């Protein structure tokens, strides 16, 4: 098996039950990479395109040394970044559900369906992340010039990073999977991050460490974003929390019921057409 295995590496063979449980951990990761890498990589490229405006706008505010300009730019750019990130999550969650279908067809349908619902979460996400980046930069910049901002601000900055990433780990899957108000999504996210604290913390640490490496490696970080960027960190994060979300909201059970109902309705329609006498 190579670094990026093909789906053939995971075909059921001798000794593998037809309805064997899904792989977990690193085995599940490589299974999805081998089977759904094309879709995740293309979704990653579109997500990078969706984030390009907000990155450029925030950087302009950074060059002006103006936090209000940075936050305002983040809010505007989040209107495009939000839908793009939502579809990155949708692509990964479909892979985790082992859902069949042509990627581009499902991507377009999901984009239209989730567009409005992802606008405000996108603004919230980009504004919060921009503020977090500013706080981290401020602390390290002061330290570089010989001034320690103090333990309370360092602790507040770290807690800010971790807590909000814990929140986002459960927020984005709900945005694309459930039709509900954002206030309820945020309430559910807080409840989930408390109820499943180890998973929420693990997902947050993955996000913080990965994007920290990307930022520290700039301008090489731009290359990392294009190749690994959103798909890698989204897949790992979703793999950690998806079991919790499915357990609480019964995602796969409800999807099966919906598809069964659609199939039953289609069959009834076909039978009705067959019973119609020809003139």
Write out the residue ranges for each language-model feature.
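Helix-coil boundary and N-terminal low-complexity module in membrane systems
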Residues: 1-137, 141-143, 150, 167-169, ...
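Alpha-helical transmembrane segments of multi-pass membrane proteins
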Residues: 152-164
């Amino acid at each position: 098996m190579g670094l990026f295995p093909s789906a053939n590496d995971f075909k059921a063979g001798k000794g593998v039950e037809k309805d064997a449980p899904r792989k977990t951990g690193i085995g599940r990761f490589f299974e999805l990479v081998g089977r759904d890498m094309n879709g995740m990589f293309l979704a990653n490229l579109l997500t990078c395109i969706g984030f390009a405006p907000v990155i450029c706008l925030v950087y302009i505010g950074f060059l002006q040394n103006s936090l209000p300009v940075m936050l305002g730019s983040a809010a505007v750019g989040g209107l495009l970044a939000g839908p793009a990130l939502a579809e990155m999550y949708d692509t990964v969650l479909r892979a985790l559900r082992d859902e069949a279908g042509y990627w581009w067809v499902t991507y377009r349908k999901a984009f239209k369906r989730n567009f409005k619902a992802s606008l405000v979460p996108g603004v919230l996400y980009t504004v919060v992340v921009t503020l977090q980046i500013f706080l981290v930069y401020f602390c390290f910049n002061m330290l570089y010039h010989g001034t320690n901002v103090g333990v309370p601000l360092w602790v507040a900055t770290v807690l800010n990073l971790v807590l909000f990433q814990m929140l986002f780990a459960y927020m984005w899957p709900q945005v694309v999977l459930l039709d509900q108000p954002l206030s309820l999504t945020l309430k559910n996210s807080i409840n989930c991050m408390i109820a499943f604290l180890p998973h929420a913390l693990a997902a947050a640490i993955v996000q913080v460490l990965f994007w920290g490496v990307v930022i520290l490696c700039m301008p090489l970080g731009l290359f990392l974003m294009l190749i690994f960027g959103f798909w890698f960190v989204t897949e790992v994060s979703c793999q950690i929390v998806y079991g919790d979300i499915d357990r609480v909201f019964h995602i796969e059970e409800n999807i099966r019921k919906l598809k069964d109902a659609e199939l039953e309705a289609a069959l009834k329609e076909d039978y009705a057409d067959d019973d119609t006498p020809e003139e």
